[in-house]
Each structure stands twice: as structure tokens, then as C-alpha cells.
Amino acid sequence: SGASKIYAVDVGRGQMDPRISRDKRVVVIDRTNIRRLKKSEIPDDIDLAVVDVSFISLEVVLPEVNRFMARRSSVIALIKPQFEVAPSMVGDGGIVRDPAARKDAAQKVLNVGERLGWKVAGLMESPIKGAKGNIEFLAFFQVGSES
């Protein structure tokens, strides 16, 4: 049956494929930073959040996502190491080449989820590299789970 409603929040505009944005179940909220998003704009409790952000750390974003989550829900977050590590760890072209730095970036995000009371349910290297070739990760959290 699929999703009954999807809220798509983006600081940009017109980023979503028109075939998706035309779907009546999709509510597009463009030009909106999640840090300024009001609960009244997403009145439903969210069962699943899929987070793919750039130029900002998930350390900032995930606590904001948490405001909208249902008591028992899930979060899938794409971890982009270049936005999680110190600038000195980011090489030419925005690539994080040091495997230890990438691991630290992933662990940092997992720690954020745990501080929010989320259970880490999985972590894997993304099968798709970032646009510039960065190795990225997918983190899966369960919100409101018994630990």
C-alpha cells in the first residue's frame, strides 16, 4: 500500500522529481530550514524519516527531526563524512580519504542518535558513493524502542 503521506522538506526549491512532487500524497515544503520548521507545518507524527542533507552536520539536523517523530518510528540518515569531520580532514574536492576519519564521522552520528534516546538498528556503507566519490554511510535508528 505504501506511504499515506510524505512530507518533503528542503532548503532549496524545485529539487524533487516532478513525478513525485505531483503525487497527492506528497507535501513539498521548499525553502525551509528544518531548524525553523514549525510543528504546525507537519501536524502528523512521522513514522519514518529519511534524511539526506548537505553542508550541515547531522548533529544539528537529527535533534530537529526528533521533534516530528512518532513515539515508535524509524529514521534512516545518510552520513556524509565531509560534513561531519573537522575541515582539516577534508581533502581536495571535498573528499574524506582517511578511513579512520570516515569511521569517526559515522560514530559521531550514531552517538547523536543515542543521545536522543534512539536505538542504533544498523549502519552500512552506502552502495552509492557521493557525487564527488565520497564513501558515505546509511544509519538506521529506531525511535521509542525498548533498548
What are the residue ranges of the model-derived segments?
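Short loop/edge segments at beta-strand edges and connector loops
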Residues: 30-32, 122-125
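Residue-level signal for inorganic ion chemistry
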Residues: 16, 80, 133
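A short glycine-rich, Lys/Arg-flanked "PGG" loop and its adjoining helix->strand segment in the class I
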Residues: 59-76
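C-terminal substrate-binding/active-site "lid" region of AdoMet-derived donor-dependent transferases
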Residues: 82-121
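Conserved beta-strand signature within the Rossmann-like core of class I S-adenosyl-L-methionine
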Residues: 72-81, 85-86
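Conserved S-adenosyl-L-methionine
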Residues: 1-5, 73
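S-adenosyl-L-methionine
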Residues: 4-60
